[in-house]
Amino acid sequence: MTSLGGRAFLWIYLVFLIAEISHSDADSIDDQCRHADSCERCLSAHLECAWCTDKEYQVGYRCLSRRQLLNYNCSETDIYENQPVLDVLQDKPLKDYETSDQAVQVTPQRAYLKLVKGNTQRMKLSYRTARNNPLDLYVLMDLTWTMRDDKKTLEELGAQLSQTLKNLTGNYRLGFGSFADKPTLPMILPQHRENPCAAERATCEPTYGYRHQLSLTDDIPAFTSAVANSKITGNLDNLEGGLDALMQVIVCTKEIGWKEQARKVVILVTDGFMHLAGDGLLAGIIQRNDKQCHLNKAGEYTGSLNYDYPSLEEIYRELLRRKINVIFAVTEEVVSSYWELSALMKEISYVDILSADSSNILELIKKSYESLIKRTQFADNSPDFIDMAYYTDCGGQFPSLQKRNYCNNVTLGKQIDFYVDVTLKKYPDNQVYTHKIRVEETSLSEFMDLDVELQRPCPCQETPDPENEEGRFLCDYKGYLYCGMCECDEGWTGTYCNCPTDATNVTSNEALLQKCRQPFSDKSTSELVCSNHGDCDCGTCLCDPGYTGPFCECRECLDCDEKLADCFCGQCVCKYGWSGSKCNCDGDTDACVGPTGEICSERGTCQCEECQCEEPYLGKFCEIDPEKDNKLCLFYEPCVTCLIEQKQGMGVCENLTEICSSLDRQETYPYNFVHELDPEQDQCLVRLVNKHGIQCDSFFVYQVIDHSNFLTIQAVDCEPPDYVALVGYISAFTLLIGLLIIFIILWYIRAKDAREYAKFEEDQKNSVRQENPIYRDPVGRYEVPKALSVKYDENPFAS
């Protein structure tokens, strides 16, 4: 009995709790609704807000939830509310390509949407890459003098090219065209126009801009023959007219033979840079490229001297519009320039390095084609007042839905689901309420059409009738009925326009004061006139500065941008897609997601698409820690190590796709090896032991541009020491040291002797000589007198 009683109590408690939560939610909705002062603002405040147009409705708030309006006796037929609708009209199942029928790669194909302003409708869109889908591959080749070996290689690889394409799809066609540059000064010397190879002491074809050699065909021998019969030409500068030629390949649909349902690919092969829009001025060509086909019957581009080169934007838009992908197969010397170009149109372009003689072109075609079919991206033509956001987990590549309209590394035959959020941000200025929107795959003629109907603004606001007799009667003939409320004539106010704006005619002061009190509220201000924040003037609150609302119950929104937010009782309620205290941030954190997949490296917050880093972190993604290693340096280190080892002949990097691609296995990072990095750039260090067993320090820098990663690497290969030379150096060094020591010793001795001799001479100069007074010379001297002197020649003893 006790157990049964406990269970009963528990059930009663749960029912009470659910009812309390539901009541709380309803009150929350009503709080958002009740401050809307017009039908349109009411329906925009919340999806469940409704407006009462009942003439007999007595409650002050006409904008509440449908349930609350019915509770306050608003007639059900006079309630105008939001009514969103989603209905799928065509939903063919996904299927692969068959010769008797076309493939279906997108489902559903058509749907109906009724949109409510400020409300989001979510619908599911599925995509699956079809097997054996048709491929149209057009080879556009630079045939200037430096590409002569590449032409010969392509000619020899014709049969192998056929087999390569068969391995990719069983339904393919090939076309061929060539280009050089505009045949005029300064692109070519006039005297060399007929033979631009004269400087090389050779003969070649006169310079031309673009020549269409072979329309798309499944005849491989015809393709090989077209390549073989094409002639080498030349130009003066190192810039080519590739964009001129590419524009013609794109827009000359009939001449090239593009098939609408095929995957259309242009592979542009060159070893030079491109002329861009404006370069034509150098040749006196001022007319802008008209994006029209100008091929004569021989396939020659006749507008080369009439129209400037196209811009990258013009090329990009035409590629998108006609669903054509472009592969830039370029040499290593110019690849960095094409990486930057491809980053501007990454969803429809691919760049890879071409070997010096184009011998790797088959591998390049296979690799780039597989990369293209592994990527799917959707775009739409929605007007600016309708927002469309895409969410997907890319077939399980992410643990949760990510805000993105593309997926990489899509497996052939695997279904990818996208969830499309469609939101009506505002009503169109032209008051057109039916629209057609196409959501299409950017590389294929696969799409979903949306028939969109916009829920019109409140109908009662569209046809005001100031002269309606019944409406004027209800408004005391001093106004007219407008959406269930009296719109008073000048000089009158009040619920029924029975209060003159001249205060001297007030008949019932207490009745007018009552109109300045909130009709129902749980707040303590319900008995206060104008919430104690204003004065009651003829039944209408005149609010003090800083307050607003019918009863001055709300603070003003000082920082709300009216274009981005609505002010509801002192709070900025951001419109769809905007956030922040001032609603000036679009709420998209995609720009703050670094290569590691983390928002601001988990060291900051994303505000207005920029990382606001915590102290002491720095960098675009807060990846730099002044006291520790750079987080992105560590992220890229395995990839760079692998690339350096591969370049230095230490083996093939087998897991390159895994460690050198983004988290969703996007195409391998573009990279470039240089002899020396810019010392002004912040460099990352990678330390590895080379094949000689020597530890070497190499350096690299990374660039992240619109989620595309670029690596520039300075690989240092430390060579082993030359022992013979080392012994020679040591011996020579030892000999030099010995000679130096001997020289120093000799110099020291000589210097010492010189000092002592100088001292001796100085002492000699300063010495004084005199005899000692007590000194007696031991030698006596006697002098014989002259008288006793004898001549030596006389004999004194002679007689």
From Swiss-Prot:
A Gene Ontology BP annotation from the UniProt entry: muscle cell cellular homeostasis
Disulfide bonds: 460-483, 475-486, 488-497, 499-538, 516-536, 530-541, 543-552, 554-569, 557-567, 560-572, 574-583, 585-608, 592-606, 600-611, 613-622
UniProt-listed Pfam families: EGF_2 (PF07974), Integrin_b_cyt (PF08725), Integrin_beta (PF00362), PSI_integrin (PF17205)
Residues bearing glycans: 73, 167, 409, 505, 655
Record topology, Cytoplasmic segments: 747-799
Segments on the Extracellular face: 27-725
Gene disruption: observed consequences: Homozygous mutant flies are viable and fertile. Mutant embryos show reduced level of phagocytosis, but normal level of hemocytes or apoptosis. At NMJ, mutant larvae show normal patterns of synaptic proteins but increased branch length, bouton number and quantal content in basal synaptic transmission recording.
Any one GO molecular function term: integrin binding
Tissue spec. comment: Expression is confined to the developing midgut endoderm and its precursors during embryogenesis. In the larvae, expression is concentrated in the midgut imaginal disks. Expressed in embryonic and larval hemocytes (at protein level).
Keyword Transferase (UniProt): no
Protein origin, superkingdom: Eukaryota
Membrane topology designation: Single-pass type I membrane protein
Annotated keywords: Cell adhesion, Disulfide bond, EGF-like domain, Glycoprotein, Integrin, Membrane, Phagocytosis, Receptor, Repeat, Signal, Transmembrane, Transmembrane helix
Cellular compartment(s): Membrane
Span of domain VWFA: 136-372
Positions of the I-EGF domain: 460-498, 499-553, 554-584, 585-623
UniProt similarity note: Belongs to the integrin beta chain family.
Role, per record: Contributes to endodermal integrity and adhesion between the midgut epithelium and the surrounding visceral muscle. Essential for migration of the primordial midgut cells and for maintaining, but not establishing, cell polarity in the midgut epithelium. Can only partially compensate for the loss of beta-PS integrin during primordial midgut cell migration. The two beta subunits mediate midgut migration by distinct mechanisms: beta-PS requires rhea/Talin and beta-nu does not.
PANTHER family documented for this protein: INTEGRIN BETA SUBUNIT, INTEGRIN BETA-NU
Subunit structure, as described in the record: Heterodimer of an alpha and a beta subunit. Interacts with scb/alpha-PS3.
The protein's name: Integrin beta-nu
Organism: Drosophila melanogaster
Gene: Itgbn
